[in-house]
């Protein structure tokens, strides 16, 4: 089997994908790309605005195009949005074109990490954000597990420690 050179980070919002991804890219001297940031740059608008104007469907279409394009690059660490796995096409591209790492976290930790963040459209203007996170986990966690080459809980470790663990696990995967 040819060695997979890309590393794709998946998992729920607040799992640390972007923070860990930056550390990982630095350790491996690879480019770091965040699919949500890429969508915002190309749209010239933030994700909340895209959700407001185009709805979640419009956002997901943009996300599919971006993930298809980004996963064709070589030597990148890609942090995906929490809902990227909802698309079968995204799951196929991610699992076929790189090492998929599922950064797992508890709903409680997610809630702590996201409660002051105003850039999470699915958590805005809802009565019970914790319940929304629970509902999302029920749908998305099995999809994360379906395509993950490696699963790592992120609740207790710093981003730097997590990035180092990922490097070791990838070395073992290909050792």
From Swiss-Prot:
What residues bind substrate, as annotated? 36, 60, 82, 140
Cofactor(s) the protein needs: Mg(2+)
Keywords assigned by UniProt, alphabetized: Amino-acid biosynthesis, Aromatic amino acid biosynthesis, ATP-binding, Cytoplasm, Kinase, Magnesium, Metal-binding, Nucleotide-binding, Transferase
Q: What reaction(s) does this enzyme catalyze?
A: shikimate + ATP = 3-phosphoshikimate + ADP + H(+)
Mark the transmembrane ranges. Answer: none
Give the UniProt subcellular location, in the record's own words. Cytoplasm
Q: How is the cofactor bound?
A: Binds 1 Mg(2+) ion per subunit.
Give the EC number: 2.7.1.71
Its UniProt pathway annotation is:
Metabolic intermediate biosynthesis; chorismate biosynthesis; chorismate from D-erythrose 4-phosphate and phosphoenolpyruvate: step 5/7
Q: Does the keyword ATP-binding apply?
A: yes
A GO cellular-component term linked to this record: cytosol
Say which domain of life the source belongs to.
Answer: Bacteria
> Nucleotide-binding: present as a keyword of the record?
yes
Do you know which InterPro entries this protein is assigned to? P-loop_NTPase, Shikimate/glucono_kinase, Shikimate_kinase/TSH1, Shikimate_kinase_CS
Q: What class of enzyme is it?
A: transferase
Q: Which Pfam families did the record assign?
A: SKI
- Residues the record lists as binding Mg(2+): 18
What Gene Ontology molecular function terms does this protein carry? Answer: ATP binding; magnesium ion binding; shikimate kinase activity
Q: Where ATP is bound, by residue?
A: 14-19, 120, 157
What is known about what this protein does? Catalyzes the specific phosphorylation of the 3-hydroxyl group of shikimic acid using ATP as a cosubstrate.
Task: State the NCBIfam families in the record.
Answer: PRK05057.1
HAMAP family annotated for this entry? Answer: Shikimate_kinase
Which PANTHER family does the entry mention? SHIKIMATE KINASE (PTHR21087), SHIKIMATE KINASE 1, CHLOROPLASTIC (PTHR21087:SF16)
Quaternary structure and interacting proteins, as annotated = Monomer.
Annotated family = Belongs to the shikimate kinase family.
Q: What is this protein called?
A: Shikimate kinase
Source taxonomy: Bacteria, Pseudomonadati, Pseudomonadota, Gammaproteobacteria, Pasteurellales
């Amino acid at each position: 089997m040819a060695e997979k050179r890309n590393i794709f980070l998946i998992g729920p919002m607040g799992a640390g994908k972007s923070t860990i991804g930056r550390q990982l890219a630095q350790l491996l001297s690879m480019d770091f790309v965040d699919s949500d940031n890429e969508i915002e740059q190309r749209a010239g608008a933030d994700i909340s605005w895209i959700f407001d104007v185009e709805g979640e469907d419009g956002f997901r279409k943009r996300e599919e195009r971006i993930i298809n394009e980004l996963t064709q690059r070589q030597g990148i660490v890609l942090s995906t949005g929490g809902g990227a796995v909802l698309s079968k096409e995204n799951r196929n591209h991610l699992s076929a074109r790189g090492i998929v790492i599922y950064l797992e976290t508890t709903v409680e930790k997610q809630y702590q990490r996201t409660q002051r963040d105003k850039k999470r459209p699915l958590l805005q203007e809802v009565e019970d954000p914790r319940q929304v996170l629970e509902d999302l986990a029920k749908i998305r966690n099995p999809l994360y597990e379906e395509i993950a080459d490696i699963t790592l809980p992120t609740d207790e470790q710093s981003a730097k420690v997590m990035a180092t663990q990922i490097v070791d696990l990838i070395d073992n995967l290909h050792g």
